[in-house]
Each structure stands twice: as structure tokens, then as C-alpha cells.
Amino acid sequence: MSRRRRPEKRVILPDPKFGDQVLSKFMNNLMLDGKKSVAESIVYGALEVMQTRAKADPVQLFHDALNNVRPQIEVRSRRVGGATYQVPVEVRPERAQALAIRWLITAARNRSETTMAARLSAELLDAANNRGNAVKKREDTHRMADANRAFSHYRW
């Protein structure tokens, strides 16, 4: 571990359309090969589809979906005396948000709809209603932590 001071967190500018910083972070994670305009068009297209389908504020639906996917607890490997234990630990808020964003994008990419905007909107609507693969991933993570609760005293 470095003894130098911790680098300061990079400030992420809010997205131009809704002025939402989390949405901007989501776009940055969705972006491939530095093509931000493509990522923006996908996200904005998905939000438009969500608005027509759900008849509700798409940014609020996005935040609901993100909160439903956000994990509270996860397991981390810890080696103790030649054995590796899966130790449940609480997830820091920044990491929980990053994991939720990553899981939503992965789940959307694995869907079968034709366009990425359609896949993303379907996954976000599912997540907002506590369904879908991203929510399943969170449930699996919580289940793993619950199953390994006996090793929680190995926390560091």
C-alpha cells in the first residue's frame, strides 16, 4: 500500500439533458471505445422508451432501478491458515453504486431485444419493479453472504 496521500476523486460532470451526475456515470460505464455520443444516444433513447411505456419520470425510474440493484453486503475471499473463506462484508456506498451500474449494463447487454436502447429500457424497467437479471445478481450476492455468515468474525 502506498504511503502517499490518496488521490482526490475525479469530478464527473452531470449529463447535459437531465443534469444528473449518476446518469452521467452510467453513460461513462456504458461507453465503448470512447464513443460517448453513442452511449448518450443509447441512454436517452432508453429513457424515452421508459417514459412512453411506464408513463412516469424516466430519471426517477432509473434511480429506483439503481437502488433496487444496489447490494448491501458482499463476500470477499480471506485466507486463514491455508483455507480460503468467503467472508461477508458491508459494501461501501460508492462501490455499491458502481456494482449496480455494472450489473445493470451487463444484464442489458445479455438481453435479446433488437437495439441496445430497447434492452437497456427493458432491464431498467424490470429492475425498477424488482425483476430482471441485475436484481437476480444482487439476490445471489446477498444469498452468498447469508450462507457464509458463520465466517463474519474474520472481517478485517
Swiss-Prot record:
Coiled coil regions in record: none
Top-level taxon in the UniProt lineage: Bacteria
Protein name: Small ribosomal subunit protein uS7
Keyword rRNA-binding: yes
InterPro entries: Ribosomal_uS7, Ribosomal_uS7_bac/org-type, Ribosomal_uS7_CS, Ribosomal_uS7_dom, Ribosomal_uS7_dom_sf
HAMAP family cross-referenced by the UniProt entry: Ribosomal_uS7_B
One GO cellular component term noted in the UniProt record for this chain: small ribosomal subunit
Subunit: Part of the 30S ribosomal subunit. Contacts proteins S9 and S11.
GO BP of this protein: translation
Keywords assigned: Ribonucleoprotein, Ribosomal protein, RNA-binding, rRNA-binding, tRNA-binding
Entry's family note: Belongs to the universal ribosomal protein uS7 family.
Gene from which the chain derives: rpsG
Pfam families in the cross-refs: Ribosomal_S7 (PF00177)
Function description: One of the primary rRNA binding proteins, it binds directly to 16S rRNA where it nucleates assembly of the head domain of the 30S subunit. Is located at the subunit interface close to the decoding center, probably blocks exit of the E-site tRNA.
GO molecular function, a single term: rRNA binding
Top-level taxonomy: Bacteria, Pseudomonadati, Pseudomonadota, Alphaproteobacteria, Sphingomonadales
Entry keyword annotation includes Ribonucleoprotein: yes
